[in-house]
Amino acid sequence: MSSQPNKNLKVFDNPNIERNFIIQINMPEFTCLCPKTGQPDFATLYLEYIADKVCIELKSLKMYIWSYRSKGEFHEAVTNKILDDLIQISNPRFMRLKAIFNVRGGIYTTIIAEYQQKNWTFKTKIDLQYQG
C-alpha cells in the first residue's frame, strides 16, 4: 500500500456482522485549503459509525484524509464529501462525521453530517457523541 496521499479507501470484512458496535476514529491532523485565500484550514475530524458488512481500513483512511492537504474546499463541502465517500465505500448502518475547524478570523466552525441506512434502527437509545 502506498504511503503517499491518495483517495483509494479500502475496507475489510466486519468481524462481528451480527452485532451493532460503534467504531470511533479521531483524526486530529486534517488540513485543507481555504478556496478563497489559499490559506490552510486545520480541523479535527471525529468519525463514528456502526458497520454493516465491512469496516474502513485505517491506513487507507489516513492516506485519503491527507489527500485534502492541497485541495481548496469550504468546510461544509469537504465534511459532506468525506462522509459521502466513506458511505459509498462502506455502506454503514449509521455514520456521523464531526469536523471541528480551528479558529479562522475569530470564528470557529463545526460541521456535523450524518447518515443512516433506510429501515435500520438501533433497538435502544444510543448517544454517539465522541468521548475522545
Curated annotation (Swiss-Prot):
Name of the protein in its database record: NADPH-dependent 7-cyano-7-deazaguanine reductase
Example of a GO MF term: preQ1 synthase activity
Catalytic center residues: C34 (thioimide intermediate), D41 (proton donor)
InterPro entries: GTP-CH-I_C/QueF, NADPH_dep_7-cyano-7-deazaG_red, QueF, QueF_type1
UniProt EC number: 1.7.1.13
Major localization class: cytoplasm
One cellular-component annotation, GO: cytoplasm
Organism: Vesicomyosocius okutanii subsp. Calyptogena okutanii (strain HA)
Entry's localization field: Cytoplasm
SUPFAM superfamilies found in the cross-reference section: Tetrahydrobiopterin biosynthesis enzymes-like
Coiled-coil region: none
Keyword entries, A-Z: Cytoplasm, NADP, Oxidoreductase, Queuosine biosynthesis
GO biological process, one term: tRNA modification
Keyword Cytoplasm found: yes
Binding site for substrate: I56, E57, L58, H75, E76
First-tier enzyme category under EC: oxidoreductase
Keyword Lipoprotein recorded: no
Function: Catalyzes the NADPH-dependent reduction of 7-cyano-7-deazaguanine (preQ0) to 7-aminomethyl-7-deazaguanine (preQ1).
Catalytic activity: 7-aminomethyl-7-carbaguanine + 2 NADP(+) = 7-cyano-7-deazaguanine + 2 NADPH + 3 H(+)
